[in-house]
């Protein structure tokens, strides 16, 4: 689960992290009071959407030369003007896709005297089986591009879970970020704070980009991207209250009601698979044959007929889907259950796109018979390779 920047900063502030003063705004009429509540004279007006690249983004409704989703304002009147221009409009960034996201919230923040911009994140490093800091002196930039072009500028420091952030870890992080004086002292305080927040709130990602060194030599968290482990949210009702479902894909919200692992993608071939590994292999082979998957959907090992029906309906709700591939290897999951669920869904919502089904394993022959006897226009496949070829050919015509 993701939260907005202003929510992430409030959370980090509650742990003792240094963040700028700011006020969230939901209506343009609130912008003036928000700005007057801050010291000024410089303000930053930030679009609050669950996507990166806001500063370089463009609003659909505005002219191409209009400012992006993060704007510097030099007066209260300037804050108000920007709020009126940004709220309710659609911001397109490199992470939103061409559809963009509507800006329904702004964060009016006090300006900062920036000396240097740094990058810091905390994540689960599966290569070493530990939580790790990833830092770079190249902050405020696309960290993926930095890692690709100059990998030596991205430093990873893994943390021993039994010891937490040690003095030696702090020394390594300060050296990697080239911090000294007051900034190094602040690092000695900040790094353990961020690690504590990550652990106690069951985060999956904490990204500060940029972490700044101000002209007075002190550190400040200037941006915060926070993601939480969905499987641990039951332990954090306070975090669940921060959820903004308007920022989430409607199909993903619906899938979560049925405990379906669903992720919307940008392609046009819908996928229903059992098992995450098989689902990824299915998406890979679709791409291999020149098409793009519209989703990741794992119905799991013990799905019921109702769950399969719900999964199929979620796939068909996506207007981008031009074909559907069902790939089931029956173990715990029985192929006849899949067949019954698909037939029930088709009878309810109809079938207007090609459907290719590959069933293998427990009750596979029974599942195939159920589908064949249904009278549905379904193409059977012998194996995964055959299934991928058939659905790609059907979609491409």
From Swiss-Prot:
Residues involved in ATP binding: 46, 53-55, 109, 112, 117
Pfam family, one: ATP-grasp_2
Binding of Mg(2+), residues: 209, 223
Cofactor note: Binds 1 Mg(2+) ion per subunit.
InterPro entries reported in the protein's UniProt record: ATP-grasp, ATP-grasp_succ-CoA_synth-type, ATP_grasp_subdomain_1, Succ-CoA_synthase_bsu_CS, SUCC_ACL_C, Succ_CoA_ligase-like_bsu, Succinyl-CoA_synth-like
Stretches assigned to the ATP-grasp domain: 9-254
UniProt keyword annotation of Repressor present: no
Cofactor: Mg(2+)
Cited Gene3D superfamilies: ATP-grasp fold, A domain, ATP-grasp fold, B domain, Succinyl-CoA synthetase domains
Pathway membership, UniProt: Carbohydrate metabolism; tricarboxylic acid cycle; succinate from succinyl-CoA (ligase route): step 1/1
Keyword vocabulary terms for this entry: ATP-binding, Ligase, Magnesium, Metal-binding, Nucleotide-binding, Tricarboxylic acid cycle
Reactions catalysed according to its record: succinate + ATP + CoA = succinyl-CoA + ADP + phosphate; GTP + succinate + CoA = succinyl-CoA + GDP + phosphate
GO biological process, one term: succinyl-CoA metabolic process
UniProt record similarity statement: Belongs to the succinate/malate CoA ligase beta subunit family.
Function: Succinyl-CoA synthetase functions in the citric acid cycle (TCA), coupling the hydrolysis of succinyl-CoA to the synthesis of either ATP or GTP and thus represents the only step of substrate-level phosphorylation in the TCA. The beta subunit provides nucleotide specificity of the enzyme and binds the substrate succinate, while the binding sites for coenzyme A and phosphate are found in the alpha subunit.
PANTHER family the UniProt entry points to: SUCCINATE--COA LIGASE [GDP-FORMING] SUBUNIT BETA, MITOCHONDRIAL, SUCCINYL-COA SYNTHETASE BETA CHAIN
Protein name as catalogued: Succinate--CoA ligase [ADP-forming] subunit beta
Organism for this UniProt entry: Mesorhizobium japonicum (strain LMG 29417 / CECT 9101 / MAFF 303099)
Gene: sucC
